Amino acid sequence: QLGRHSVPAVACGINYAPEDIAQAVDTWHVDSVAFDMVMMISDPAVIKGGEFQVFQGTKQEGQSLLGIRGEEGRDSELPAERVTTVAFPGAGYGFLQQGNMIFHRACRLLEKVERVTLIPSFEVLPASSRDATNSINMLEWTDPGLEAELARREIWRAAARLNALLDSISIADDRGTLHRLIGDALEPLNSLRASLKEPRS
C-alpha cells in the first residue's frame, strides 16, 4: 500500500527546465524515494528535446558505466541501445516509477521553452513496513526545516515498528532474536541520528 510521502519537501515537487538550455533538465540519477510519479504539466507537442529517458539495466550497471555511485547525477551519455525514451502523449499524462531503482534522466532542451513536471512522491504503508526512502541522502538537501521533518518521519516509523514488535514478540524468543528484532526496528532511526552528528558536506 502506498500513501502520500510524510516529508513535505518531497510529498509533491515541481521541476522546471534550467534557464541555460546547455544544461540537462535532470542528469542521470536515482531518486531518494522509493516511489514517485512524473506528470508532464506543459504541452509536450511544443517541446523540442527534454525527453525523459530510462536506462535498460540495473541502477548499479548504469552508475558503473558513468563512474558514479549513490544518488549523485552525471550529465553524460549512456549507450543509445540501452536507453528508452518515455513519451508523454499530452499535458496531464504521467507514470508511476520505482524511483530509487530506475536510473533515469531528463535531456537538455533544444530550444528554450517552458517544461514543467509535477513529481508527487509516496511511501510504503503501514508505517511499520519497509520503505526505501533515503533519509540520509536527503539530509544533504538545503530545504528549510527538512532535517526536523526527516527526524519526525523516522521517529514515526520507528514507533510503528516498535508497536508492531510489541504484538509479535514471543516468550520463546531468545536473547539473540530479541537483540536482532529490536535492532531492526531502530536501525533507520539510529542511522539518521548518527548522520545528524556530521556536518553537511
Regions found by a protein language model. Name each.
Residues Q1-G50:
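Conserved double-stranded beta-helix
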Residues A24-V38, A127-N134, K197-R200:
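Short, Lys/Arg-enriched charge-dense amphipathic segments
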